[in-house]
Amino acid sequence: HNGMDVDIKMAGRVRGIDAILGGHTHDGMPVPTIVSNAGGKTIVTNAGSNGKFLGVLDFDVKDGKVAAFKYRLLPVFANILPADAEMAALIRKIRAPYEAQLGEVLARTDGTLYRRGNFNGTGDQLLLDAMMAVQDAPIAFSPGFRWGTSLLAGQDITREWLMDMTATTYSYATVTEMTGATIKTVLEDVGDNLFNPDPYYQQGGDMVRVGGLQYQCDPTAGAGQRISDMRLNGQLLEADKKYKVAGWAPVAEEAKNAGNKQIWEIVEPWLKDQKVIKPGKANEPRLVNVLPNQGLA
């Protein structure tokens, strides 16, 4: 569970691994990456997340070694394939006490709500907008989680979808006073976690999602030099000035034990009040020095 980049580096350094069926970065890779090392070659694959694909890897083994292989990424058409009866019955039994709560409609979306993006997604923007409105904060941070399902225009936003986007063991909502310098440090730390040229220093996750704040990012720059031109309402942030910042999913123990609400308790009443969500363009930084690498955007 390292992520694609870490798997590729490790495969180039470690002998004796025939294949790595990876996870963590949730990349749906239609073809494998073949990595050479001192002992031969290693196949590196990823099959996405949330049961969207099934990675199928067949080996032709001769004399105790892999002579050939065939890899396919199969889409899972969950609404077409018949469910396993025994498993479906177990799921219904476990869900039964919570079915009504999970199925409650909180709002409807007029556009696609998605999570996966290097810098933001419309689903995460929804969380940011809710935090800023409910907690009266001009800036909001939301973790760069990669998991989650999408909603299409016209679909209901249910409590189950909200939980799907937010349910962790540390989903507490926070409001913090941060200086401009601290905000830059936070963005730089997460940026280095994502863009460090050494995959072993990439700890997983996309860039922290940011609401209310505009900034410039150079993914190719060194540590501490990637983030610049941070602005709130068009005005440059001041290093020593304090700003009110909403967020969720703190890792510090004191934040976990502060008695704060869970993030879904913040977002749910906001959704009910909105009734209809009209997703606009997600707030993303202005990127520099990224062409021709379209993948960074």
Residue ranges and their predicted role:
Residues 1-5, 146-147:
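Short, internal active-site loops enriched in acidic
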Residues 4-58, 206:
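Conserved beta-sheet core of the metallophosphoesterase superfamily
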